[in-house]
Amino acid sequence: RTEAEKLQKQRERITADAVQTLKSKKGVCQGYSSLFYEVCDQLGIPAKMIPGASKSMLTHIGKLPEDEDHVWNKIYINDKWELVDVTWAAGIITGEKPKFEFRFNPAYFCTPAELFAYTHFATAEAERETGMTAREFADLPLYYGSYLLANFDLETPITAFLKPRANDILLRLNFLPE
């Protein structure tokens, strides 16, 4: 197949995912991201779908991001590319028996790359805006969506693995300007 045929097939898959998500009112990241991509396309907003690894569970700490388990978007607005995760913005998984709970989080729209990189690691190196390595990503603590809305930044430690000295652990927080 030619490159044009491959791109056409990929485009058809994205459209099919978007339509299915809209019709069923259900979806996972592929469907959400495809639907957002299609909406952007219809509005004339340049958009991309970015596959990669996510960090959303405690078991992800220390694990290298080798498997693609998530997809999100980049959109070009106001003369720059912005990161968007419509799936994580829509809600969270809760409970012993995993269930999706709608809980809108606007922090996943046009998220600064430095914050986005705490939980998202693009497969394509060209899409990693911070230059973070796979090992650095793996060693990060687990950041929840509420952290993105907080008015502070964790200055130290920058890894999830803490080694206490004399039974003390020092945490430094920077409170951000309002």
Where are these regions (language model features)?
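Hydrophobic/aromatic-rich core segments of domains that either
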Residues: 31-114
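Secondary-structure boundary elements
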Residues: 1-28, 32-38, 43
